[in-house]
From Swiss-Prot:
Function: Acts on tyrosine phosphorylated proteins, low-MW aryl phosphates and natural and synthetic acyl phosphates with differences in substrate specificity between isoform 1 and isoform 2.
Protein name, UniProt field: Low molecular weight phosphotyrosine protein phosphatase
GO (cellular component) term, any one: synapse
Active site residues of this protein: 13 (nucleophile), 19, 130 (proton donor)
Gene: Acp1
Regulation of activity: Inhibited by sulfhydryl reagents.
Amino acid sequence: MAEVGSKSVLFVCLGNICRSPIAEAVFRKLVTDENVSDNWRIDSAATSTYEVGNPPDYRGQNCMKKHGIHMQHIARQITREDFATFDYILCMDESNLRDLNRKSNQVKNCKAKIELLGSYDPQKQLIIEDPYYGNDSDFEVVYQQCLRCCKAFLEKTH
């Protein structure tokens, strides 16, 4: 559910059920804790149609619950409008980045800055690996990476 604000960020992964909804929920919590949530429009999306209409992966939801973060999202695919209306589109891996750059080239009024979320990681882990075929500890790794990256992104754009 996108929020209205003066800045906007869209988190993107392949299916929009693991990494990007975790990043979205983490960032929502950070901006809420900083009392700047009114300044942000935040959402997440997929490059593919594989999981459209599905809730986040239960393992990701369990991981977020453990950290006291609520997740409320239904998977959707990125749209042409997203490229024109979001300031930042932050994705998880090189495949996402290639797909997004290819799609953005088909949008005349693309204003979004498309980057890897991992480019903000102070620990320099550029890629946020897909935990879909992994276990609970893989989801924890994704959470920790998203937390570090989202904090750094917020500091840079705040």
